[in-house]
Amino acid sequence: SSERESERWIASDFAFNTSGFVTAYKLKYTDTDPDFREEMNIAYTFNYNADGQMQKISMKVDGKDDEGSYSESGEINYTYNNKVLEKIEAKSKNITCSQTYEYTQAIKNTYNAMPLLLLPEALASDDCVFNVFAITGYLGNAGANLPTAMTIKNTDLEDPSENSTERYNLSYTLNENKAISSYTLSGYGETMTFPCDWTNF
């Protein structure tokens, strides 16, 4: 899928473990916009802990745009406490993005759901294939509880003016069977609600 007609995403070379969770795939992105052409190849590998929860994501990127060729790599690490997700930290070059979760009440994740707020922010916003894998259960077991707050901290060692910290309160609307119908982020005078319509996948 793409936001512009000039963009294309093609995923390939999928690998899975014995639990059915994805352990690797490749993603090719192309943008044929005449004002800024780009081609990018991303290779992902995924590691899980003994509880079947995502532990580490490794990425290698090779690309080419109007400014020339480039290569970079990065990794995303997950931290849990008693099967409850505490932190996701993504590192690439001199940039670190951490997502820290708070749990002020025990809201059980009854159906092992993985809404986008439990994914690394960069991948959730840029990689539609990753999102589909998460929503359909191919990225391992989710946290045992649903968080009630989230803090996103971006640190740029080369340009500290880009550093930022944002904190959001989280709430959920559950169906009669305790499945997530929607979730809401609130903070800084804004409230954003996102539906969880699993039938679209």
Could you describe each region identified by the protein language model?
Residues 1-201:
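Buried hydrophobic residues that stabilize the cores of well-folded domains
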